[in-house]
């Protein structure tokens, strides 16, 4: 099997409007499709970044919380590449988004930082 790329990552949120604001207004993604699925009582948004499908944002009634932070089995975090980490952190600060201190990858010598989405899903910004 030859995999070409990651097509998208699905994220279930507890507060759809809050998460929609976070992924669009804070992270700068664009919603290209948004639908209400009556049979599941669920909203679904397809979020794109630079013309690439990235996040499938779902709402479901009463989803359970993440079992632990962040070491539960399964998806650990989402990572996005940025050109300038300091500039990206300034934007997070300007939008009131708390983040951890900047760290440096011991293997690549690249800088990175972690913060969380509204449901506590860890997100990493990794400098190019």
Q: What are these model-predicted stretches?
A:
Residues 5, 41-43, 74, 109:
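Exposed loop/turn and edge beta-strand positions of beta-sandwich/beta-sheet ligand-binding modules
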Residues 1-17, 75-78:
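N-terminal beta-strand motif that seeds the catalytic metal site of vicinal oxygen chelate
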Residues 1-2, 35, 46, 89-128:
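Vicinal oxygen chelate
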Residues 71, 78-86:
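Mid-chain, well-packed structural core segment of small domains
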Residues 32-34, 40-43, 62-68, 101:
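A short, acidic/glycine-rich surface segment
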Residues 11-54, 94:
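Core segments of cupin and vicinal oxygen chelate
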Residues 51-54, 62-63, 85:
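Short, charged/polar surface micro-motifs in flexible loops or helix N-caps
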């Amino acid at each position: 099997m030859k995999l070409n790329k990651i097509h998208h990552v699905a994220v279930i949120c507890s507060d759809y409007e809050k998460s929609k604001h976070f992924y669009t207004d804070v992270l700068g993604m664009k919603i290209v499709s948004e639908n209400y699925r009556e049979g599941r009582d669920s909203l679904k948004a397809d979020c794109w970044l630079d013309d690439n499908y990235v996040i499938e944002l779902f709402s479901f009634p009463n989803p359970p919380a993440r079992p632990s932070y962040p070491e539960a089995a399964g998806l650990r975090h989402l990572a996005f590449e940025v050109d300038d980490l300091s500039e990206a952190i300034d934007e997070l600060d300007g939008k009131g988004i708390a983040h951890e201190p900047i760290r440096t990858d011991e293997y690549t010598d690249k800088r990175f930082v972690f913060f969380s989405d509204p449901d506590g899903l860890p997100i990493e910004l990794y400098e190019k």
